Amino acid sequence: KLNRDADVAGPDVDGNGVRDDLDAYINSLPDTEPQKKALRQGYRVLRNLLLLDTTDTTAVLDGMRNSAASIWCIYSRYGSDANKKSGEVEKYTVNTEERFKAYARFNAAASGHSAVMPRGDGCDE
């Protein structure tokens, strides 16, 4: 069951940057461990985008770079299923009005800027 608290961050008891409900979802998947790591990176990065100070241009640009890397990582680990997986990351993370508004603020702040695709597969691990 997805967390729908008014809190944008949501619970993260283990402090890995991924909401606990999404961590449980990832753990329940039959995917490979490298694929699960890619999903965790995607969920962590998107959660961070919702929480960053959108008045800080450096933070926004860093967020854009991290987002591009996490998407590239998912594509490198999932191949033809990557588009579906990337869509799930967004759908499951931005699942309340408060989170949607935070995501809209980030996207508005990022508008007009460009990000460079990462070197390699974009994966943290």
Regions found by a protein language model. Name each.
Residues K1-G15, D21-E125:
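Calcium-binding acidic motifs and repeat modules
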